């Protein structure tokens, strides 16, 4: 990569010397155990778009773009590299670190911000949330393709649609969807139902509609995008209802 880049602009406006090794570490992580991909190819594609005082945010987006541009019929595995890079960005944006926070901390934080439904805290004890947290398999994020992870980032993860601020990562979404849907089940058995359903949806065994993926667990409590419309059994009534 272009080592002549002098400074990178951080989120708080500070500048610091461009750290090539940091880029290497991220790409090494993103390509671990993925065959037929090249760190240097990704770096070369990103190199021509770097400039002095580039925002740190843009550097990571360039890496994502560079990996995505290498996806082809001959080199399909770059779709998993690009997906990991998107997921890395999601976690940094949400948690300011690569490791997700404990589930209970995420729930408390997002309920306080008004983006999660407070009923989650009413329906589940901290101990129950901790049990669910211990069951979450964050490494399942590695099974996403680039297209799938971008769809999560842009469509399904709870976020401020105006500022694009994200409040969760994929496995948190899956676990809280399961927890919300089974919240009224008997307390003696519901954690098993939640875990089983989490396993099903987080391994793509069942595909959920957008309203459930994006709305369940939030204050909107949206479960469906369908609307029931009633009309009489006459052509005039049907036409009037449709308009």
Identify the role of each PLM range:
Residues 1-243:
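Extended catalytic cores of very large enzyme megasubunits
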